[in-house]
From Swiss-Prot:
UniProt motif LD motif 1: location: 3-15
One Pfam family cited in the UniProt record for this chain: LIM
Major localization class: other
Annotated protein name in UniProt: Transforming growth factor beta-1-induced transcript 1 protein
Stated role: Functions as a molecular adapter coordinating multiple protein-protein interactions at the focal adhesion complex and in the nucleus. May regulate both Wnt and steroid signaling pathways and play a role in the processes of cell growth, proliferation, migration, differentiation and senescence. May have a zinc-dependent DNA-binding activity.
């Protein structure tokens, strides 16, 4: 037994201290583990440099990798010396096997880096750079929109300590934003060939009612600060308030765009303003085939902003409704005011519909039409009553179709026989004493009707008893014989032959 203990002691002394430690899960006899120094603190810069390196590989030190292997408790050692030597050999074999198994297991968990994996990581880094570039582009759009609003300010207080060029990332803060310039921001990665260029600066534009502040974080040796705030807020005295020239803003914008292009960030303009002929960033108005800044799309006469209201075009220039109607709209001949909506054109003039009225009755003339006399408009009733012809039959005004006869004008329905009111079918009529008559009543008025048949007598006639008869219609009332020969007798205004009269009244 003492020999076994001595061999075990020699084994522990000869075993290298950097070999992996075998731990057991047995709670009865926990084995002491070797105390190692804590891992070094995490450094983001070191991690970033290791991450961006495409050719470096992580060194794998097998001696510093540890694993936990479940070790079952060994059986008790036989007191015999021969059995102790066998047990010692078994322990040595098991130790060597366990050491190789642990090493293989750890190496399988940490495979070596091949070039394909390194290439994939490089692509991920490029995508991150693109994302940062897109975020910088969004910030550029926000800054350019704020610069458009900045043009509308009349004056600002300006304090310049040293000249500097504006480059890098920008941010526009609206009222109510509480961002800090010291907070980390995502910016586009600078290529290696531009590392010697001046370090970009970031600045912040804060727009609020009565408060305009432009701050620049000093990264290089230059600093530009322009503010219009009280001295108690800004912490520095402003010598005097001066207006910012338009060229300063334009040059600042040009320098900003050139700096972004040098970093590989493309800036796209939305066109040139038709009024100022400068690039448009942010909101844009498209009208009349051109693009405009919203603050430059104004009325050509009164110079007020048109915005989303209606406008009119004249010779390629926009006008608001009020000025367009006052300048170019036709005017009413009565009230001499511009005609905005419906219009009546008559007698060489333009009129409001409610102002185009009859000269006599003052009623508006509608779709029924009007009549003109000496340059004045009249409704139909007043015109024909004053100046129109009168029907000879009904003494009413003749407005539409008429018949001219007997020296006058007649309504078609009024030109009929004066006695029986029968229309003249064939267009022929007879006139007696200035009146139109049919043939029957004409002969009746003249006494040329046959007393026997009551038809007009156009040929020979026989006069008897104060009446006229056709020769064949003068007959005896009793025997109906013709009385064209000889004499006849009369009784109660009826003719009789001699025989019938003697027989009846003799």
């Amino acid at each position: 037994m003492e020999d076994l203990d001595a061999l075990l002691a020699d084994l522990q002394i000869t075993t290298p201290p950097r070999c992996p430690v075998l731990l057991t899960d047995s709670p009865e006899k926990p084995q002491p583990t070797e105390t190692r120094p804590p891992p070094p603190p995490y450094d983001p810069k070191t991690a970033m440099s290791n991450k961006t390196s495409d050719h470096e590989t992580f060194p794998v030190d097998k001696d510093h990798l540890y694993s936990t292997v479940q070790k079952y408790p060994l059986p008790s050692v036989s007191p015999a010396l021969g059995g102790g030597l066998c047990e010692l050999d078994r322990l040595l074999n098991e130790l060597n096997a366990t050491q190789f198994n642990i090493t293989d297991e750890i190496m399988s968990q940490f495979p070596t880096r091949d070039p394909s994996e390194q290439k994939a990581e490089a692509q991920k880094e490029a995508e991150k750079r693109a994302l940062s570039a897109s975020s910088a582009t969004l910030e550029l759009d926000r800054l350019m929109a704020s610069l458009s609003d900045f043009h509308k300010q009349n004056t600002v207080s300006q304090e310049v300590e040293a000249p500097g060029a504006y480059k890098g990332s920008e941010e526009v803060s609206r009222p109510g934003d509480t961002e800090d310039l010291s907070s980390p921001r995502s910016t586009a990665c600078v290529p290696k060939d531009l590392e010697d260029a001046p370090t970009p600066k970031s600045f912040k534009v804060v727009s609020a009612p009565g408060h305009l502040e432009v701050k620049t974080n000093q990264v290089n040796s230059d600093e530009v600060t322009a503010s219009r705030v009280p001295d108690s807020v800004s912490g520095s005295k402003v010598p005097e308030a001066t207006s910012v020239p338009r060229s300063d803003l334009d040059s600042m914008l040009v320098k900003l765009q050139s700096g972004l292009k040098q970093q590989g960030i493309e800036t796209y303009s939305k066109g040139l303003c038709e009024s100022c002929q400068r690039p448009i960033a942010g909101q844009v108005v498209t009208a009349l085939g051109h693009t405009w800044h919203p603050e430059h799309f104004v009325c050509a006469h009164c110079h007020t902003l048109i915005g989303t209201s209606n406008f009119f075009e004249k010779d390629g220039r926009p006008y608001c409704e009020k000025d367009y109607f006052m300048l170019y709209a036709p005017r009413c001949a009565l009230c001499e005011l511009p005609i905005v909506q419906n219009m009546v054109t008559a007698l060489g003039c333009t009129w409001h519909p409610e102002h185009f009225c009859c000269k006599v009755c003052k009623k508006p003339i509608g779709e029924e039409g009007f009549h003109e006399k000496d340059g004045e408009q009249y409704c139909s009733d007043d015109y024909f009553r004053l100046f129109g012809a009168v029907c000879a039959g009904c003494t009413e005004a003749v407005k539409e179709s008429y018949i001219s006869a007997l020296g006058g004008l007649w309504h078609p329905q009024c030109f009929v026989c004066h006695v029986c009111h029968t229309p003249f079918i064939n267009g022929s009529f007879f006139e007696h004493e200035g009146l139109p008559l049919c043939e029957t009543h004409y002969h009746s008025r003249r006494g040329s009707l046959c007393a026997g048949c009551e038809q007009p007598i156009t040929g020979r006639c026989v006069t008897a008893m104060g009446k006229k008869f056709h020769p064949q219609h003068l007959n005896c009332t009793f025997c109906l014989r013709q009385l064209n020969k000889g004499t006849f007798r009369e009784h109660d205004e009826k003719p009789y032959c001699q025989a019938c009269y003697a027989r009846l009244y003799g």
